Amino acid sequence: MADELNEFQEAGNFNEEALMRLSNVCARLRRMQMLESDVEITVVDGELKRVPRQMEKVKDGQVENNAGGFVFPVSDETQVRRFLILGSDKGSYHQSSEKITIDNAQRIIKIIEQGNGHMVLKELALINAENRNPKMNAMIFTLAICARISTHDTTKKTECPMLNAYSDYIRALHDSALDLIPEVCRTPTHLFEFVDYCQTISESTKAGGAKSSTGWGRSMRNAISKWYTTKTTEKLAMLLTKYPQREGWSHRDLFRLAHPNLMDSRSHGQSEDRLEREQLFRFAVKGDLVKRKRKMSVEEVAEVEKVWDKKALKLPYTEEQLIKEEQSRALNLVEAYLKLKNEQSEEVIVAAIKKHGLVREHLPTTSLNSKLVWETLFDVSMPMTAMIRNLAKMTVVGALDEKRVDNIVKRLTDQEELRRSRIHPINLLTARAVYAQGRGDKGSLTWEPNQKICDALEAGFYKAFVNAPPTGKRYCLALDVSGSMTSRVSSSPLSCREAATGMSLINLHNEAEVRCVAFCDKLTELPFTKDWKIGQVNDYVNNLDFGRTDCGLPMTWATENNLKFDVFIIYTDNDTWAGEIHPFEAIKKYREASGIHDAKVIVMAMQAYDYSIADPSDAGMLDITGFDSAVPQIVHEFVTGKI
């Protein structure tokens, strides 16, 4: 059963027909907006009002750009994609755990308010279906905005056609967003995050003296109920037990707010899994199960009926439903989970893992220091990402004997398994750095690294190049060689140099046209080819002279030498500019001189906390601060022109 919830969640194919009604409503609203371009609609005291359109205020520090040069314009679609993938509608990605707020999404809100909600949800659904977003928070936040924006009393009709059209648009937008919940919120963690964002948006978008909205109207209740009722019983049991609570929310909270009632569905009464599902719903609310009906005495049945759903009791259970409950694997899993909460016996825990396919999250915390428990978790087909994440823990408890080490080496160097698991090379490089250092960043966990595993992680890094698809672009990769590049990347065991050389090797191996240069206050061409290993590259760079950092040099060098590149990637630690020409100006001059008007530049400052080189109005510039597992996918999306 654990296989149903593998580490990588497959998304379904996007069905555009599901958004057809919203598309038609949007088109009608935009036609009306074109006729009344001097007004806009807002919510005042819970009602829609027409107000004169205001010129957008120029933000503090913004000035009109008269510098000239070629600028690659940013469309509304690009801004939406940037927000969904980067977590920002500007040309920047910040490796940070900070929570997204309504202030981060003002441009997205403006696009929706202008009647383009269909485009926003279409982009969201497509990116989600293709698994193009490396993180879920911006995706879920956008879905919550679409589900809660401009909440008003939809029962009141006015004599103004435009207000009525806007009201229809908002209602269709809310309905379409709620319909997407099962596809976007694939785990309870996502669902809890969505609900939390909805509550935040409801509170922060109250206008004037509007009465506070709980956010739990009929549509919201039905959507949350549907998330639970459409799961198979075995998958629902796994979800309820593996993810009992997150983000300050629990399944019990959602059930008490959404009031899902299985008997509201006409088909439920005749469903074979009716009793099984009613038991799971009880577990979600009460945290326990009642004895299965086939095993109850008459007295026990009478006691249970006192607290059971009265609607359910009106319809007798069929023989098939009683048999299904009695033999239920889903209920067996929940019972095993409940029994293990205070279990101390390793033998009992191990037997439960083998019988029910339990995963780490099901087990009591005290058992996670057991060698036998980890041996069993590994042996019952541990998913690749879970195996990589737990290498250190399994080494500490002594669970990795020679046979299991050989198994790990085989899996890490199996290109087909790496392909199926979609493990990016950088994830393996990072895992190697974590494992090889023999200690954790938090707590007192230390271990003696197994050299075979270290070597396999590096070998897997090269094998996993298949998971970094080529873009067909011409690259100039510029590596800062200043001494500070040996320091660690923010929130990572990799040094800035290791991260830069790792990313560079992926491009060198997978792309047809790549040139590497080293820069500080001067520029040096590098002899790297796809045959070089990461150790060779690091040793070579370590022997170069270094000075101050001039991030404009690579573009200036390419301009002066009439070289043709589609993409410049600047790898540095913290200093982003110390030269005569700003990178912002250097790329514009390069575009003008080369005729490659959509040439792109990425400045990756891996230790910086907050900086901005990119012009947010230029779709060909991207800032990245910090470095994490999301960066490679973000770079690919940017280079291929998708954000």
Swiss-Prot record:
Record's keyword annotation contains Repeat: yes
Which residues of this UniProt protein bind a divalent metal cation? Answer: S482, S484, T549
Which UniProt keywords are given for this protein, alphabetically ordered?
Answer: Cytoplasm, Metal-binding, Repeat, Ribonucleoprotein, RNA-binding
Residue stretches making up the TROVE domain: 63-473
Q: Which InterPro entries match?
A: TROVE2 (IPR040322), TROVE_dom (IPR008858), TROVE_dom_sf (IPR037214), vWA_Ro60 (IPR056800), vWFA_dom_sf (IPR036465)
Q: Name one GO cellular component term.
A: cytoplasm
Question: Where does the sequence pass through the membrane?
Answer: none
Q: Where in the cell is it found?
A: Cytoplasm
GO function terms (MF aspect): metal ion binding; RNA binding
Q: Where is this region: RNA-binding?
A: 186-390
Q: Where do the record's region annotations for VWFA-like domain lie?
A: 465-643
| Source organism superkingdom | Eukaryota
Its domain comment says: The horseshoe-shaped TROVE domain is built with 7 helical HEAT-like repeats, and is closed by the VWFA-like domain giving rise to a ring-shaped monomer. Single-stranded RNA is bound in the positively charged central cavity. The MIDAS-like motif in the VWFA-like domain binds divalent metal cations.
Job description of the protein: RNA-binding protein that binds to misfolded non-coding RNAs, pre-5S rRNA, and several small cytoplasmic RNA molecules known as Y RNAs.
Q: Which family does it belong to?
A: Belongs to the Ro 60 kDa family.
The name this protein goes by in its record = RNA-binding protein RO60
Q: Which organism is it from?
A: Caenorhabditis elegans
